[in-house]
Amino acid sequence: LIIHIERDDDSNIQEYQKYLQNIMRKRKNKIILTTLSPDTHRTSEENLGLAYLTAVLRKRGYNVEIIDGWLGGLSDEEVLRRILNDKEVAIVGVSCYMSNNDKSIELAKRIREVRPEIKLMCGGFGPSFNPQKFVKDGVFDIAMIGEGEESIVEVSDYFTENSDRKIEDI
């Protein structure tokens, strides 16, 4: 879709906003992307990976929320509570680092216990380095290796379409 926007004409902007709203209505399955605070240190840097992935998913029409436990100073329990209380969430993606890998796995186990219908995916340094640790015993449905901007859309489409098609390179 290409829309030319004139400086004094906001009808094209409204048309584009309508188009995006229609896409959002089509995508009933909400995605939450999250990361937990590390136990080892505290910084005020935002997780750009979550922001990039959110932008890519929203461009494809997904309703995405970021719950950044690290930047928001949220406890693991608060992150878990927000996820479990969201009745629209269908997919949770967890950004994992060496400093929060074990906590991320524990979060996934607890989500799986209470809301087994939620699809769980993870990415980041931990899953890229040792994906088996994250998918072992069905904790996460998928561990993404490397950059996730392309694969997260394909995986999200796969989960929301309940497809039995094969995902390339998985």
Task: Give the residues covered by each predicted segment.
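Short catalytic helix/loop segments, enriched in acidic residues and glycine
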Residues: G49-L57
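Nucleotide-activated donor-dependent transferases that construct or modify glycoconjugates
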Residues: N29-H41
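N-terminal amphipathic/basic-hydrophobic helices that include classical n-h-c signal peptides
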Residues: L1-N22
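Glycine-rich beta-alpha loop elements in corrinoid/cobalamin-binding modules
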Residues: V56-I170
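A short, glycine/small-residue-rich beta-strand->loop->alpha-helix junction that serves as a flexible
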Residues: P38-L48, C96-N101
